[in-house]
Structures are given as structure tokens and as C-alpha cells.
A protein has these predicted regions:
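Class I S-adenosylmethionine
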Residues: 1-52, 179, 187-188
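Conserved SAM-binding loop of SAM-dependent methyltransferases across substrates and taxa
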Residues: 62-74
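S-adenosyl-L-methionine
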Residues: 84-118, 123-127
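Short, well-ordered alpha-helical microsegments
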Residues: 44, 63-66, 88, 112-113
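C-terminal substrate-binding/active-site "lid" region of AdoMet-derived donor-dependent transferases
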Residues: 125-189
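Conserved class I S-adenosyl-L-methionine
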Residues: 52-62
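Conserved SAM-binding motif I beta-strand of class I
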Residues: 77-82
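Conserved acidic residues
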Residues: 53, 76, 117
Length: 189
């Protein structure tokens, strides 16, 4: 597992509260990860499971996804697009071994143009209400064969709704219902 620790570089801060880590820039929270919750583990696993070939990830975050991608045999290379240079510098300090294996591009993922087999989108602010315009833009600019974006299973908890979304984003995986619900956090009470 990557090293997670409270650290600050300029206006970018990683804060820790027990098993919860959050990434802040100019007092805006960009991500929060509780390393002990099933929801985040399922979401992470969905991206690992579909990844193959040349993988482009948007948003560097805490390297949880990237470390697992590097371990996967079907993944040839991992390119990460990260806009915030301070996040890149933090991870170089905390996790130099992982960072040395990644190809990091310091750029705005919303403007980046490229090509890959698997596109994994996760550069939203933490409380982003409407991710679809960002996803649409990245899918238009980065040619890819398949993609997922972070929190898709929180946004679309029903299989029928996910299938409707696939009409707009045809490169989303064509999960069977059982595959889909493997990643959805459901209240069983």
C-alpha cells in the first residue's frame, strides 16, 4: 500500500483523521478516502478489474489505484495526468518507488489530448455534483477503448440506470447485472 501521511506543500495539504485521508487545495477538498470502507474498496476494484493495455488515469490522488494498476499483468503502462504540481511533489516525497514506475504528465486533464486503451477519470472536486460534463470532455479529448469514472456506482446504483448511461458513453464496460452489483454499495437492511 502506498504511504499515506499528513503533509503540506504550498497551498496543497493532505490531512489525516484516523483512517480517513483528505486532499485539500486552497481550502477546497478534492478527495477523501477512508481506507477501511467497503465502498471505496469496491470503487477502486472496479477500475483495477477493467484496466488493460495502455492506461490513462486523471488525477494522481493517493496512488491507491495506480499501485494496483502497476501490479496487474494486463496493464502495459500507466500514465497519470495531474494538474497540481504540489500533489506530484507530495507523492514523489511519500512514494518515490511507485512514482518512478508511472509516467506523470503535469497538465489539466480537461484539456489533455491523447490515446489509450483504458481511461480512468478521477480529477473531480470532492463535492462535484455533475461529473458528466467533465467525463464527456475527457472522453472526447482522449481516444480510448473503455472507461470508468470515480463514483459512477454511487451515482448510478441501479443497473437499468447504468445501461441508460451506456447509451451516452458507449465505452463504459458492458457489465452483466451480477458484475455491476459487485461494485455497488447497497444497503442490505
Amino acid at each position: 500500500m502506498p504511504t499515506l501521511d499528513a503533509i503540506q506543500i504550498n497551498d496543497t495539504v493532505i490531512k489525516q483523521d484516523g483512517s480517513e485521508f483528505s486532499l485539500w487545495y486552497n481550502d477546497t477538498r478534492y478527495m477523501c478516502e477512508n481506507i477501511n470502507t467497503m465502498e471505496s474498496l469496491k470503487e477502486l476494484q472496479s477500475q483495477i478489474d477493467i484496466a488493460k493495455g495502455h492506461v490513462v488515469c486523471t488525477g494522481l490522488g493517493f496512488l491507491l489505484r495506480e499501485e494496483k494498476l502497476l501490479e496487474k499483468e494486463e496493464v502495459e503502462c500507466v500514465v497519470v495526468i495531474e494538474k497540481n504540481k504540489d500533489v506530484i511533489d507530495m507523492q514523489r516525497k511519500l512514494n518515490p518507488e511507485i512514482m518512478d514506475k508511472l509516467f506523470i504528465i503535469n497538465d489539466d486533464a480537461n484539456l489533455y489530448e491523447g490515446k489509450c486503451d483504458t481511461l480512468l477519470i478521477d480529477h473531480f472536486e470532492d463535492y462535484e455534483d455533475n461529473k458528466l460534463p467533465i467525463v464527456t470532455n475527457c472522453c472526447k479529448n482522449i481516444q480510448h477503448k473503455q472507461m470508468l469514472y470515480w463514483d459512477i456506482f454511487a451515482d448510478y446504483k441501479r443497473y437499468a440506470n447504468y445501461q441508460e448511461l451506456r447509451k451516452q458513453f458507449v465505452t463504459l464496460p458492458n457489465f452483466t447485472p451480477s458484475q455491476f452489483y459487485k461494485y455497488v454499495e447497497r444497503d442490505e437492511s
